[in-house]
A protein has these predicted regions:
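Active-site phosphate/pyrophosphate-binding segments
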Residues: 1-99, 181-196
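Short alpha-helices
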Residues: 1-16, 121, 125, 132, ...
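Short flexible/disordered coil segments
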Residues: 22, 45, 103-111, 158, ...
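Glycine- and acidic
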Residues: 39-44, 71-72, 112-116, 142-147, ...
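Short, surface-exposed linear patches
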Residues: 63-68, 96-99, 120-125, 164-168
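Helicase-primase coupling helices
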Residues: 75-150
Length: 196
């Protein structure tokens, strides 16, 4: 992370600022939704810079909670790119999906458009419109809004989601710190490799 030019101290400061009560509440909400038949969580972003962060979220939640025939399947969505393709299902499809939206309210580059609004403004308008449409359609949404994207907010999010994933594992009565499914395919691979 430091090699990429990020300030580690700010990342750790953000983690220390994490509201642990909110992280616990998020874990409880996820567990309650799971008990009601919501088996897929969409991590939805409107900022392309967050794309690999949502890939990490998929790994985090799948590995900590996807075991013993339990767990919520994490997927990632980049809006507005995915609005037309997945928006129809979210709005009117089977109610097995809930979403966690991570929206960056202010982005550093604020390019103006012919509509008198910046791209950042249009992204925020799209996020609000989708949230209202999903609310009207009965889609459950957790919305996390960040003022801006920087090392401190990323540190906050990392700790928030790591804590939530661990607590959520315990709520499901699974060990959030092992990966027996991953270990199994690795064992089979090594067996085949060593026998050739």
């Amino acid at each position: 992370i430091a090699v990429a030019g990020l300030d580690i101290d700010k990342l750790l400061l953000g983690a220390r600022k994490c509201d642990k009560d909110e992280a616990i509440k998020y874990a409880i909400i996820r567990n309650e939704l799971y008990s009601q038949g919501y088996y897929i969580e969409s991590f939805t972003i409107y900022e392309e810079k967050m794309l690999y962060f949502t890939e990490w979220l998929k790994q985090l939640f799948a590995e900590t909670q996807g075991k013993d025939n339990k767990g919520i399947l994490p997927i990632s969505v980049l809006n507005t790119r995915d609005l037309h393709s997945l928006g129809q299902y979210y709005q009117e499809g089977k109610r097995i999906i809930f979403e966690t939206v991570i929206n960056i309210v202010k982005e550093r580059k604020n390019i103006k458009t012919n509509y008198g609004k910046s791209l950042n403004d249009i992204n925020n308008i799209a996020c609000d419109a989708v949230a209202k449409a999903h609310y009207n359609g009965g889609v459950y949404s957790n919305i996390i809004e960040l003022d801006e994207l920087n090392e401190e907010t990323i540190g906050y999010l990392i700790y928030f989601f790591e804590l939530s994933a661990a607590i959520g594992g315990y709520l499901l009565h699974v060990n959030p710190f092992d990966q027996p499914g991953v270990s199994e395919y690795k064992r089979i691979m090594m067996e085949v490799i060593n026998n050739d």
